[in-house]
Amino acid sequence: FLVSTILVLFLFSVVFRYFPRNFNYFFQFSDWINFNYKEDAVLVSVFAFPNILMVFGLSLLTSFVAFYHSILDPIESAQLKLGSNVLQAEDALLFVAQKSILAFVMFYGRYLVYHIFTSLFKIEQLAKPHFFKSVQANIQFFSILYFGLFLIYFIAGSAYQPSLEQISILVDAYFLVRVVYFYFLFKNSFNLNNISLAAYLLFLEGQVVFFGIRQL
């Protein structure tokens, strides 16, 4: 936990130091109560270097949460230990590296998916906003979740560990709140057909709500 926390803090510190506008955008929690999408200079390109750094930081966060999830799951924990009673450091590093790379590819892969399906639903202008708002919401939620788990570990040690069910409920609730938030945000910010918007979000965000933490 300590090593992973230092790594995440270092990465976000670099963005905060050299790209403060990007950092402020992705950690602007007040957006959850502001249902208006505004273009910003940091949103010009999803492949701008600071945005890539933030997506990579998000990939690390989700891989750490996935690692914690796997430790709590008896079947996945047994696979991680590979027959040994103690989890080896190299196995943990390999797991996190694989999950981080996979998550990074999937996050940018969803940008392509957004382009395809916004075109199918005739709401092409939504592809980039959907990507940025998804990344922003995910960074905020998984930062809170991860550092919450870190504080619990730091204060209580191994004496108390949140159950797999508790973490799953939190993640599933987040994804459900997110789809409702996206609907009202995009409805208020763009001139869209409400039926097309609802169908689009139900299709793309619905699968996220359905699978929840299992996607990690």
Regions found by a protein language model. Give the residues of each.
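Core alpha-helical transmembrane segments of integral membrane proteins
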Residues: 2-120
